[in-house]
């Protein structure tokens, strides 16, 4: 009774403990006294001691389990036990993986193609006993720890677990037959579930859909054919032969790659002259920050009421590229970025007049002031809007790290620009009469006059850089420009220089090989290319988009690259994309930097003659394999016989693979360079056995003729097939990437000496790294895919007809597709094939779609469960807590973790199965036989 009274007094004195601060309770917990018995410190109360609740209170302590704070991460522990104490696994209310896998990950936009409840039902139906004590394995484990997003297949039963689901009188042969069937059905089920989960996604259709995959293949083949034409052109004019794939010739290699890119972009020989020009310093564009003088000039500018109304009613969002000025002018969130172009459009427009009335000017200026000044005191009704706009401005300032020049520099730049514009007015107006009667040669004539303006513009914003996409006829554009210049005021002359730059740029070579790009870190599998293009087409200068293949470790999310023209303000476009969501998915747009090192060195050992000859052989094999895969050079009349000989020789692995007439120019007479030569007789007569070479090494021997042949092959693989040979990798979907032919690996500096063992080891290792290009992809046969659950088209059509044939009553049948009623099922069949033949065709395409997925030996699928793929024999036979996989059944009753009574097999290494169950068939079990020594005395004691 005394104990109860004391405990009641303590509770009453501490009744406000829930309102005290966490730090106070932590101190009280740390300063507690270690007093035994029931009258000890408060830390020994039942609700405070997690170890007493279940034992002394008959399980009542389960209401106060402290596990929840452990899974919330770092934070205060309100009222439970010491942070240093961890409960045994048997006390856990939920498993460690409860939060990570069941709930949708917010950064993936709630997308999860696999219904976790369905997985749980499927797995728990076989393993219902796992609900005890939270020891069940996760239905879907993550590879690489709990923080990984990698999905896996559910765990497959091993043979021991499968035996426990069968009858005890089953034979060994029957067990093995059923277990084989179980594994086959399990694999079929996983393939079918994966197909159903991803069949509506664009990336999956591009791989296996009977129509979409053909379109995608033809598109890729068109890219390759275009690259082949460019390579042949460069090979014929000597560009390819004039360069060596050495890291010392990095500039020449970059020039060749850029030449290819310009040709691929549709450039001409005139555009190639841009490669001879020194690149400008203005590479990374910054946000435009104009001086206040230009803002005031913009406010004084005159525009028609029609244009002003269009600007006010424009529904486009605020943050767009500065190049997108055909639709609207300055918005409330853009401040002064588009002021120059707004004035420019007024200069060129037919409705801009200098004779507008003064009241109208005041009214227009008042409207512009309201649109530009966020803190305007004249607008009383927009206080909340101005505060939100100021927040937006702060975010933009934080987003744009490199923000303009200082006020003094901007003022000086503005002054210099105005003086240069005044100096230009007289020469340009004198040329107006000459431009009317002859072709325009103004770009050359004005180069020297524009240099000073361009230097000043370099200190300003990239918006002054012209956009080569927006072009009109040079003659008309220049004529209109020059006619308007005499009538404009001083401020407008400054603004029209953008048009002058556009005019001059039209006659100059185009830098088509240089682009700006944005990287999308997070694209859901359900997002299509058309949706991304619809968003990007709003921005002027958009070129293309590349979407990578999905990754299983990222839950099939993809990455993307959006390519724009070089002269756009890429940061503003990136800001606009970050303010948009596609299918409730944040794309995570960031600016993609330019390539840092385009020519990267490889091992210098590759220049050795023996290695070069081996590389020629490997390059020729890869070129043949890839040409045949994409049907390049397939117009040869004897293609069938040649390909058959190529297949036969590739299986043999001999150099005779290249002994046929190929239309590929880099493979012609290739066998002449594959025959090795050596002065064996001379070495034998002189006693040069090569022992010294093996020990001391030999100098690098270069054969320029072999190297030139190899360089042609390496450049062919790099330009046509996007294979970087010296990096033993392929750059996928390069035709859609921002940098076509961006990176190449070349031979690095050669070592002084090299041993024969090093050479042989290098050749062997490098060939193993290139196996992915040397082996041909062979699709699975009909018999092989039948084991994987392939479908038959006619069978599926019959199932479709039966599913759409419903009997309502006697001699009364319904077709759900049309809602019509018929007297018999045969009429419905005829009706479906006649009126709904498109539905029948869809069923056949679906069957072909699924079978195409099964035929691919490298088909994407979920990785196997770790318990299925990694199950050592010694580990799988162990039970309890020491085994690799959890036991099939829990320990006996509610025993503590790892404990088992005698002869029950609990604990580490124990059996952990009820004794009534068996582990092996009856044939492998025998009756226990007792042994007794017949020579022993009758009543003797047994000591051993």
Curated annotation (Swiss-Prot):
Belongs to the ARS2 family. The modification Phosphoserine is found at residues 82, 304, 332, 352, 429, 641, 643. One of its GO terms (biological process) is siRNA processing. The modification Phosphotyrosine is found at residue 80. InterPro entries: SE/Ars2, SERRATE/Ars2_C, SERRATE/Ars2_N. Keywords: Nucleus, Phosphoprotein, RNA-mediated gene silencing. Residues 321-330, 651-661 have a biased composition (Polar residues). Interacts with cbp20, Dcr-2 and pasha. Disulfide bonds: none annotated. Residues 1-101, 291-493, 640-661, 852-887 are annotated as: Disordered. One of its GO terms (cellular component) is nuclear body. Residues 332-341 have a biased composition (Acidic residues). Residues 365-374 have a biased composition (Basic residues). It comes from Drosophila yakuba (Fruit fly). This is Serrate RNA effector molecule homolog. Residues 8-34, 41-50, 291-314, 342-364, 391-448, 479-493 have a biased composition (Basic and acidic residues). Acts as a mediator between the cap-binding complex (CBC) and RNA-mediated gene silencing (RNAi). Involved in innate immunity via the short interfering RNAs (siRNAs) processing machinery by restricting the viral RNA production. Also involved microRNA (miRNA)-mediated silencing by contributing to the stability and delivery of primary miRNA transcripts to the primary miRNA processing complex containing drosha and pasha. It is found in: Nucleus. Its main location: nucleus.
């Amino acid at each position: 009774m005394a104990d109860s009274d004391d405990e009641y007094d303590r509770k009453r004195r501490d009744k406000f403990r829930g309102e005290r601060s966490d730090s106070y309770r932590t101190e009280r917990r740390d300063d507690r006294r270690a007093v035994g018995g029931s009258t000890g410190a408060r830390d020994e109360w039942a609700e405070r001691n997690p170890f007493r609740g279940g034992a002394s209170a008959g399980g009542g302590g389960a209401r106060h389990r402290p596990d929840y704070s452990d899974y919330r991460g770092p934070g205060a522990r309100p009222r439970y036990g010491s942070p240093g104490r961890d409960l045994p696994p048997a006390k856990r209310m939920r498993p460690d993986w409860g939060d990570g896998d069941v709930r949708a990950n917010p950064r993936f936009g709630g997308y999860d193609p696999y219904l976790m409840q369905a997985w749980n039902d499927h797995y728990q139906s076989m393993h219902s006993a796992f609900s005890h004590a939270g020891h069940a394995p996760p239905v879907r484990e993550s590879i690489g720890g709990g923080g990984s997003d990698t999905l896996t297949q559910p765990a497959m039963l091993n043979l021991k677990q499968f035996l426990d689901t069968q009858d005890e009188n089953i034979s060994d042969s029957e067990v093995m037959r059923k277990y084989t069937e179980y594994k086959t059905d399990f694999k079929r089920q996983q393939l079918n579930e994966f197909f159903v989960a991803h069949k509506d996604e664009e990336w999956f259709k591009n791989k296996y859909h009977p129509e979409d995959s053909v379109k995608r293949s033809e598109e890729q083949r068109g890219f390759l054919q275009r690259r082949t034409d460019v390579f042949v052109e460069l090979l014929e004019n000597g560009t390819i032969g004039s360069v060596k794939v050495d890291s010392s010739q990095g500039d020449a290699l970059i020039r060749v790659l850029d030449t290819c890119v310009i040709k691929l972009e549709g450039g001409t020989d005139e555009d190639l002259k841009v490669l001879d020009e020194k690149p400008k310093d203005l590479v990374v564009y910054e946000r435009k920050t104009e001086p206040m003088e230009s803002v005031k000039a913009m406010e004084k500018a005159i525009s028609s009421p029609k244009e002003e109304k269009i600007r006010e009613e424009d529904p486009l969002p605020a943050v767009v590229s500065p190049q997108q000025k055909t639709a609207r002018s300055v918005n409330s969130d853009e401040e002064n970025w588009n002021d120059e172009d707004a004035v420019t459009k007024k200069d060129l427009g037919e409705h801009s007049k200098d004779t507008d009335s003064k009241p109208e000017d005041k009214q227009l200026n008042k409207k512009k002031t309201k649109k530009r000044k966020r803190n305007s005191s004249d607008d009383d009704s927009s206080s909340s809007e101005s505060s939100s706009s100021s927040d937006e401005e702060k975010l933009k300032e934080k987003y744009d790290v490199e923000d303009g020049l200082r006020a003094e520099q901007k003022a000086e730049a503005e002054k210099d620009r105005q003086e240069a514009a005044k100096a230009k007015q007289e020469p340009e107006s004198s040329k107006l009469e000459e431009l009317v009667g002859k072709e325009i040669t103004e770009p050359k004539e004005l180069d020297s006059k524009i240099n000073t303006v361009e230097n000043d513009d370099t200190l300003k914003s990239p918006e002054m850089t012209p956009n080569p996409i927006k072009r009109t006829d040079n003659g008309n554009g220049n004529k209109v420009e020059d006619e308007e210049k005499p009538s404009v005021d001083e401020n407008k002359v400054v603004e029209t220089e953008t048009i002058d730059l556009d005019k001059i740029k039209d006659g100059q070579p185009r830098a088509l090989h240089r682009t700006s790009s944005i990287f999308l870190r997070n694209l859901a599998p359900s997002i299509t290319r058309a949706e991304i293009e619809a968003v990007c087409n709003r921005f002027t200068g958009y070129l293309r988009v590349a979407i990578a293949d999905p990754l299983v470790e990222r839950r099939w999310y993809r990455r993307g690259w959006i390519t724009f023209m070089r002269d756009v303000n890429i940061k503003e476009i990136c800001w606009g994309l970050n303010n948009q969501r596609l299918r409730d998915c944040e794309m995570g747009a960031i600016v993609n930097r330019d390539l840092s090192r385009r020519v990267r060195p490889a091992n210098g050992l590759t220049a050795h003659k023996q290695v070069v000859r081996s590389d020629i052989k490997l390059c020729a094999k890869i070129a043949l394999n890839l040409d045949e895969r994409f049907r390049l050079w397939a117009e040869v009349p004897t293609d069938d016989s040649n390909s058959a000989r190529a297949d036969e020789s590739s299986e043999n692995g001999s150099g005779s693979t290249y002994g046929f007439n190929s239309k590929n120019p880099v493979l012609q007479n290739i066998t002449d360079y594959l025959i090795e030569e050596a002065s064996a007789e001379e070495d034998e007569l002189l006693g040069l056995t090569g022992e010294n070479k093996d020990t001391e090494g030999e100098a690098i021997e270069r054969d320029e003729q072999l190297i030139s042949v190899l360089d042609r092959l390496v450049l062919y693989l790099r330009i046509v097939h996007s294979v970087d040979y010296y990096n033993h990798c392929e750059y996928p979907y390069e035709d859609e990437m921002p940098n076509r032919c961006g990176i190449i690996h070349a031979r690095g500096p050669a070592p002084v000496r090299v041993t024969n063992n090093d050479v042989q080891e290098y050749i062997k290792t490098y060939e193993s790294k290139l196996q992915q290009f040397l082996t041909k992809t062979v699709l699975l046969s009909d018999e092989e895919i039948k084991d994987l659950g392939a479908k038959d088209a006619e069978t599926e059509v019959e199932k479709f007809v039966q599913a759409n044939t419903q009997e309502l009553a006697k001699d009364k049948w319904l077709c759900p597709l049309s809602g019509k009623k018929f007297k018999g099922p045969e009429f419905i069949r005829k009706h479906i094939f006649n009126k709904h033949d498109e539905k029948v065709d869809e069923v056949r395409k679906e069957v072909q779609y699924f079978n195409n997925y099964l035929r691919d030996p490298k088909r994407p699928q979920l990785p196997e469960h770790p318990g299925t793929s990694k199950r050592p024999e010694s580990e799988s036979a162990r039970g309890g807590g020491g085994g690799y996989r959890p036991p099939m059944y829990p320990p006996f009753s509610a025993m503590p973790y790892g404990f088992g009574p005698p002869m029950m097999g609990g604990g580490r290494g124990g059996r952990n199965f009820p004794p009534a169950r068996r582990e092996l068939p009856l044939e492998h079990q025998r009756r226990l036989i007792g042994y007794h020594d017949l020579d022993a005395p009758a009543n003797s004691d047994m000591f051993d």
